[in-house]
């Protein structure tokens, strides 16, 4: 988890609107989501617990987790899902199981860049962050 710990600033997002639409997110929330460039803050809380916080001018959301343990999460677009995060071969993998859809998010760090690849059905979104100061 060490490479993921820190503050990350979103630089670009490709394909996010299509993912949100597929997940049933309403038009207004999708438009707001596309305008936001949130900071992602990943913290080590100790005892194997971590916190992930997404902060923007419009909305802040966060959750705490232990790797390999399922938990309830309310996503930034207000969907209730069961989530689980694991690390495999340097990839922070997250599975979000919702009522109708399952979403997969793979986060990988390349130097000072974090790339999050979001998949829902055949749709793919890539969100790129740079390490903050």
From Swiss-Prot:
Pfam families: Lipocalin (PF00061). Disulfide bonds: none annotated. A fatty acid binds at residues 107, 127-129. Keywords: Lipid-binding, Transport. SUPFAM superfamilies: Lipocalins. PROSITE patterns: FABP (PS00214). CDD domains: FABP (cd00742). It comes from the Eukaryota. The keyword Transport applies. One of its GO terms (molecular function) is lipid binding. InterPro entries: Calycin, Fatty_acid-bd, ILBP, Lipocln_cytosolic_FA-bd_dom. May play a role in the acquisition, storage, and transport of lipids, and may be important to the organism since it is incapable of synthesizing most of its lipids de novo. Forms a beta-barrel structure that accommodates hydrophobic ligands in its interior. Belongs to the calycin superfamily. Fatty-acid binding protein (FABP) family. This is Fatty acid-binding protein homolog 2. It comes from Echinococcus granulosus (Hydatid tapeworm).
């Amino acid at each position: 988890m060490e490479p993921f710990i820190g503050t990350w600033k979103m630089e670009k997002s490709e394909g996010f609107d299509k993912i949100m639409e597929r997940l049933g997110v309403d038009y207004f929330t999708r438009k707001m989501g596309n305008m936001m460039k949130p900071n992602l803050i990943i913290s080590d809380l100790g005892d194997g617990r971590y916190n992930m916080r997404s902060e923007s001018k419009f909305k802040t959301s966060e959750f705490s987790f232990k790797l390999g343990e399922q938990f309830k999460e309310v996503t930034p677009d207000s969907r209730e899902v069961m989530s689980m995060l694991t690390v495999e071969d340097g990839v922070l993998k997250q599975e979000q199981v919702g009522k109708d859809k399952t979403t997969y998010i793979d986060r990988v760090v390349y130097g000072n860049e974090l790339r999050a690849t979001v998949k829902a059905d055949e749709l793919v979104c890539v969100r790129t962050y740079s390490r903050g100061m």
